[in-house]
Amino acid sequence: MFTLKKSLLLLFFLATINLSFCEQERNAEEERRDEPDERNAEVEKRFFPIVGKLLFGLLGK
């Protein structure tokens, strides 16, 4: 029973690492394909909600 748990844990660990590497590769490929304008739009989409929440929190108190 112990060896089965050990094997499953090892398999899960290796699968998690493999998935992580796949995501990093995919993100790198997407960055290479993106045009600079598209990347700026993504940054703006992430930036404005954060600033809005921060200002709302400061002004709301």
UniProtKB/Swiss-Prot annotation:
Belongs to the frog skin active peptide (FSAP) family. Temporin subfamily. Antimicrobial peptide with activity against Gram-positive and Gram-negative bacteria and against fungi. Has been tested against S.aureus (MIC=7.5 ug/mL), B.pumilus (MIC=15.0 ug/mL), B.cereus (MIC=75.0 ug/mL), E.coli (MIC=15.0 ug/mL), B.dysenteriae (MIC=30.0 ug/mL), A.cacoaceticus (MIC=60.0 ug/mL), P.aeruginosa (MIC=7.5 ug/mL) and C.albicans (MIC=5.0 ug/mL). Also shows a weak hemolytic activity. One of its GO terms (biological process) is killing of cells of another organism. It is found in: Secreted. The modification Leucine amide is found at residue 59. It comes from Amolops loloensis. Keywords: Amidation, Amphibian defense peptide, Antibiotic, Antimicrobial, Cleavage on pair of basic residues, Fungicide, Immunity, Innate immunity, Secreted, Signal. Coiled coil: none annotated. Expressed by the skin glands. Residues 23-46 form a propeptide. This is Temporin-ALj. The lineage of its organism: Eukaryota, Metazoa, Chordata, Craniata, Vertebrata. Its main location: secreted. Residues 1-22 form the signal peptide.
